[in-house]
């Protein structure tokens, strides 16, 4: 949720943020109205309760002659208090809905517009000239790494098996990411992949894209699409100690996405699937440290991409392509030879205080006063990386060179039929 103090003092900035996202700026006015109505309802209920308390004291001190009239007055006040409290509850519900409807305020400098309005920040490496390149699925099937046919037989479309050295390749990626994370002060966490509705909502995943999330209706639980979700809930309703610096966690989990809005997109191979593994970095810090932590997360992602030796670019994602929680997001996109374009391998988001405010995660400032923490997240490795590795390192004979950093995990320098 956005900061109400900031909203009241800077409504035009929030309206501008909404416009840059392609979202309705009128939601800002709806929230301001709901905020004013809620405060008025609280004040009215408080005043009536004070009157009721004073009237009760008068009844206790009244003479027999005065008591009947005072009792009648007290009864009337009790009814008024009941009505005022009901009005306050209604105002609270309206306010909460209006508050939840507004996305995080984008950071100055984020490109306005939709998916194609990103800014390229850096391009690393030159794509190899590959004559008649094979795609990752053709390579993966020929080398015994990926089995989509049996995945579909067992679970349906967009499911797969990783087999033999394909499984080792993914495990190697994950272990490289874990090593990089723990070497840089992250605590490794293997979290639950099922979470309660309030945790999913707290991270911002039950908004406009709620249909992308798997829900177990009989248990009222959600399967996570990223370990960002359980890691954001890890310190919910807590005051954490940030006096020694940010708290950094690396979550390794399976992830699940319905891909409900992706009909007909990336239907071949493992670019867009319902289940995959991922190592996700997650950081709690003071708000003033968030921008620097965002740059550090991006730096660690770039270290990982250097280890798999693929050409990539870094983009500043446009406001209209941000999730509701993110105030800024950087993507690293690897070159995919058969598509002749760059595809996302990592993203890292600065969520400022948006998630922590919803989840009530705070820290104490230098005066001991509780303040809302900032949160950030970023991909350190995921199954999709196999696409970039297989396609960029393919050889004319149909084999694939294994990046040097992954050789110890895979057990060979070349994947051959």
From Swiss-Prot:
EC number(s) stated in the UniProt entry for this protein: 6.1.1.11
Chain sites annotated for binding ATP: 257-259, 273, 344-347
A single GO molecular function term of this UniProt record: serine-tRNA ligase activity
Enzyme superclass (EC): ligase
Alphabetical list of PANTHER family matching this protein: SERYL-TRNA SYNTHETASE
Subunit and interaction comment: Homodimer. The tRNA molecule binds across the dimer.
Name of the molecule in the record: Serine--tRNA ligase
Organism: Mycobacterium sp. (strain KMS)
Lineage: Bacteria, Bacillati, Actinomycetota, Actinomycetes, Mycobacteriales
